[in-house]
Structures are given as structure tokens and as C-alpha cells.
Curated annotation (Swiss-Prot):
Its EC number is 5.2.1.8. It comes from Chelativorans sp. (strain BNC1). Consists of 3 domains; the N-terminus binds the ribosome, the middle domain has PPIase activity, while the C-terminus has intrinsic chaperone activity on its own. Residues 437-476 are annotated as: Disordered. The gene is tig. It catalyses: [protein]-peptidylproline (omega=180) = [protein]-peptidylproline (omega=0). This is Trigger factor. Belongs to the FKBP-type PPIase family. Tig subfamily. GO terms for cellular component: cytoplasm. Keywords: Cell cycle, Cell division, Chaperone, Cytoplasm, Isomerase, Rotamase. The keyword Oxidoreductase does not apply. SUPFAM superfamilies: FKBP-like, Triger factor/SurA peptide-binding domain-like, Trigger factor ribosome-binding domain. It is an enzyme of class 5 (isomerase). GO terms for molecular function: peptidyl-prolyl cis-trans isomerase activity; protein folding chaperone; ribosome binding. Residues 169-254 form the PPIase FKBP-type domain.
Length: 476
């Protein structure tokens, strides 16, 4: 087998491989000899089939197997022997001339093919000294825990129907029809809808219009949808609503005690508070870690400047762009609504793709040198968490897909590996904790906003069709 380099420019490589006809013939004869003792042909005793007869029958198919074997096995070996790591699967090129291909399959010509690929550049890991990170830490006050406990407890609050007028805190059962320019609009109507006045379930102003109404009352009023409303065809528009109140119910006194906790499946009110505090601390702790991670990645981005493989960058950009445009389309928004242009957005996300690829390669190299591993148990837990996002009837099928598809499984492993590398780096750099307020912790800088959009965490999404009158949830 002869290997010659055709292209060596930057990270791009192209090599030509020639397997002499006599080598191909030897590989074919080895397969025929192996088949000789296995095939059963009428008129021949086992193991007595002449090789030439076998060749006439199976020669081309066996030679095709030899070609595939060389392409699959030799390609990896050749690149590895060159001391290179391909960024992606090499592109294989070989003759498209049918006559030439027939000669190869007949063992009458050399088998020639070429591999085109980009290499992962060598990365020399630098000293972490000098990287300083300020980690924002928010101490959850008792008042916030109390407020959240009340919200959770409110989910099991009972209401008693009353004859009087609706007040703030009352639950109103109603039918409504929303109209634009006198015509009902899609998703703007509902029957037997329940709303607790003051809870902010509906768009601003809607719940206030219900105050003072009694069961049996009807009312028509106008409300303007917020400019930032998720459904673009409703954003900023004035709509008219016809409302019929079916029932007004007053909230019974809410006492947060052990009995209420038991309704929630807990043994005591103290346990409820303990769980709520733990959830809040975990939630804010994740935000703290993400901001520390962001600073770490920014520092690494400044330290490591090298050419990233263009194919990896292209693939990353395509993933980002697909997510961004899909989210915009589902929200009924445009780049103008995001105060940018498509060209500017492309440039921004191209830079983000390059950054992600570079940092991914750096973290991979650091993890490799530190012998960081993702255990089977960690993979299993992550896989189970992944398939739980799918409907129950699909979960076994999804599980089997991941277990049988190495590339899909690698997509589960990659974020686990990255987080373990980040954890190790955070334990090695200079980290200073800084007490901050809740608002300061929740504040999002521009770079974080772009990352979230690229990850599909857009702030503005389309409202569910049957709830167009309702306000977007906090997550949206």
C-alpha cells in the first residue's frame, strides 16, 4: 500500500492511497480460500470447489468486500499512523469510471482512492495562573422562602362559591370570546375558563376588568396586547372581549400547617419549607455556576487563539442557525423584531460557532490530559433523563436508538464530559465569592443572551393557540 500526500495547507489534508493489483489479488484469494471450506455447491463435495469456479461466481462481490474493508479499516489506520486526528469523518473519493472500476473488481488494476479531511490542530495546554473569577452568590432570605411556600400552598387552596361581586383573590369561572376588528381570532375564546384575580394568568388588564362582576353578569371590554406578546399577530393589537361570568368563588383562609403539607404529600410544614429552600438554593446555585463557567470560558477564549477546523465550525453554525430561525418562526417574529438584520445575525452566530468549536477542542484536550472519564453510571443516568422527555410509549424505542447509535450516545456523553472538565478547572483557578442581590444574579449580559438564543432558550415564544388571552408564562 502506497500513501502519498497531495495537499497539506493549514488544517486541510488530502492523501492518495494506492493498493497494488497484486495485493488486491492476494486479499481476494484469501477470501476465496476461506469460502472454499464453507460454501455448499451442487455437484461438489465440501471443500472441493475449485477456486476459479468460486471466483467466477463470487469474485466481484468478494472484491467489493475487500474494497470496503480497505476503505473502512485502512483509512483510520493511515491517518493515525500520520499522527493526525481528523476533525470529522474523512471524505473518500475514488474513480467514477465504470471500466476502471470493473478492472479493480476483476483484480486487473491497482485500487486508488483519496482521503480529504481537516486535522485537529495541536493544542498546548497553558498555565491557569492568572485566571481570576468572581462568583456571584445569592443567599436566599427567609422571606423569599415564605413567599414560595405560599405559592405552592396556594395550589391546594380551596374556594367557596359566593353570590357577591368578584374581588381580588377570588376565582372566577367564565366564558370569553376575543375579537380583532369585530371578528373572533384564533385561540381567543374559551369556555369554563378559571382565573384567580390578581394571579396574572391573563394579559395585563384582563383580570382587573372582572372585579365587581357577579355570577350571570356579562361584560364587553377592550384590552391591548403587550408589544412583546409571543404571538406576533396579536402583539400591540387592541382586542375586544365578550365575557360571561358563570361563578365567583372566594378563597378560604390559607393556613400553612402540617395538614396542608400532608395534602402535598409531605409529613410536615417544616419539611415543606426545607424542600422549598433546597429547590431555590439549587436553582440560584445553577445560575451562580453558569456565570462562573461563563467567566472561565471567556478567559480560555482569550488564551487560546487558533484556527478551528472549518467543517466543525460549519456544522456548529448550521445547528445554531437552524435553532434560531426555527424559534423565530414558531414565535412569529423576524430579525427586525430582534433589532438586527439577517446578515448581522449570521456574522454574530458565525463568531459564536467558532468560539464554541475552539473551546470544545480546548476542553477536550484538557480532559484528555487529565484522564477525565464519564462513568457508565453517569451515562445511564443522563440517558434515562434524556428519554424521560419523550412520551412514555416512545421511551423504549428512544432508549434502543441511543444504545445502538454510537453517534447519538456521544451527544449525551459530550455535555457530561464538558461539565466535569469545567468543574476541575473551577477547582484550580482563583475564585472569589461575591454576595449579590437576586436582581444582580438574574441580570443577563449580552453575551449570555446570544448563547441562550443559540441554545433555543428564547424569551419570546408563541402563546398556545387556545389560550391567546392568557399571558406568557415566566419561562417564556
Amino acid at each position: 500500500m502506497q500513501v502519498s500526500e497531495i495537499l497539506n495547507s493549514g488544517l486541510k489534508r488530502e492523501i492518495k492511497i494506492t493498493v497494488p493489483a497484486e495485493d488486491m489479488e492476494a486479499r481476494l484469494m484469501a477470501r476465496l480460500e476461506d469460502a472454499k471450506n464453507k460454501v455448499r455447491l451442487k455437484g461438489f463435495r465440501p471443500g472441493k470447489v475449485p477456486l476459479q469456479h468460486l471466483r467466477r461466481m463470487y469474485g466481484k462481490s468478494f472484491m467489493a468486500e475487500v474494497v470496503n474493508e480497505i476503505l473502512n479499516d485502512s483509512s483510520r489506520t493511515i491517518i493515525s499512523d500520520r499522527g493526525e486526528k481528523p476533525a470529522m469523518q474523512p471524505e473518500i473519493s475514488m474513480t467514477e469510471d465504470e471500466k476502471e472500476a470493473e478492472k479493480v473488481l476483476a483484480g486487473a488494476a491497482d485500487f486508488e482512492f483519496s482521503l480529504s479531511y481537516e486535522v485537529i490542530p495541536p493544542i498546548e495546554i497553558k498555565d491557569l495562573a492568572g485566571i481570576k473569577i468572581t462568583r456571584p452568590v445569592y443567599d436566599v432570605p427567609d422571606e423569599e422562602v415564605d413567599e414560595q411556600v405560599k405559592r405552592v400552598a396556594d395550589s391546594v387552596r380551596t374556594y367557596e362559591a359566593k353570590k357577591g361581586k368578584a374581588e381580588k383573590g377570588d376565582k372566577v369561572t367564565l366564558d370569553y370570546v376575543g375579537k380583532l376588528d369585530g371578528e373572533p381570532f384564533d385561540g381567543g375564546s374559551a369556555n369554563d375558563s378559571e382565573v384567580v384575580i390578581g394571579h396574572g394568568q391573563f394579559i395585563p388588564g384582563f383580570e382587573d376588568e372582572l372585579i365587581g362582576l357577579k355570577a350571570g353578569d356579562t361584560k364587553t371590554f377592550k384590552i391591548t396586547f403587550p408589544e412583546t406578546y409571543g404571538a406576533q399577530h396579536l402583539a400591540g393589537k387592541e382586542a375586544e372581549f365578550d365575557v360571561t361570568v358563570k361563578e365567583v368563588a372566594a378563597a378560604e383562609e390559607l393556613v400553612i400547617d402540617d395538614e396542608l403539607a400532608k395534602k402535598l404529600g409531605l409529613e410536615s410544614a417544616e419539611k415543606l419549607r426545607e424542600i422549598i429552600r433546597s429547590q431555590l438554593e439549587n436553582q440560584y446555585g445553577q445560575m451562580t455556576r453558569q456565570k462562573a463557567k461563563r467567566q472561565l470560558l471567556d478567559a480560555l477564549d482569550e488564551s487560546y487563539k487558533f484556527e478551528a477546523p472549518s467543517k466543525l465550525v460549519e456544522a456548529e453554525f448550521n445547528n445554531i442557525w437552524s435553532q434560531v430561525t426555527r424559534d423565530l418562526e414558531s414565535a412569529g417574529r423576524t430579525f427586525e423584531d430582534e433589532e438586527t438584520t439577517e446578515d448581522d445575525a449570521r456574522q454574530e452566530y458565525q463568531r459564536l460557532a467558532e468560539r464554541r468549536v475552539r473551546l470544545g477542542l480546548v476542553l477536550a484536550q484538557i480532559g484528555e490530559e487529565a484522564s477525565i472519564q464519564v462513568s457508565d453510571d453517569e451515562m445511564q443516568r443522563a440517558l434515562i433523563e434524556t428519554i424521560r422527555r419523550y412520551p412514555a410509549q416512545q421511551q423504549q424505542e428512544i432508549y434502543d436508538f441511543y444504545r445502538q447509535n454510537p453517534q447519538a450516545l456521544a451527544s449525551v456523553r459530550a455535555p457530561l464530559f464538558e461539565e466535569k472538565v469545567v468543574d476541575q478547572l473551577l477547582s484550580q483557578v482563583d475564585v472569589t465569592d461575591q454576595k449579590v442581590s437576586r436582581d444582580e444574579l438574574l441580570a443577563e449580559d449580552e453575551a449570555e443572551g446570544e448563547e441562550k438564543k443559540a441554545a433555543g432558550e428564547t424569551k419570546k415564544k408563541a402563546a398556545p393557540k387556545k389560550k391567546a388571552a392568557k399571558k406568557e408564562s415566566a419561562a417564556e
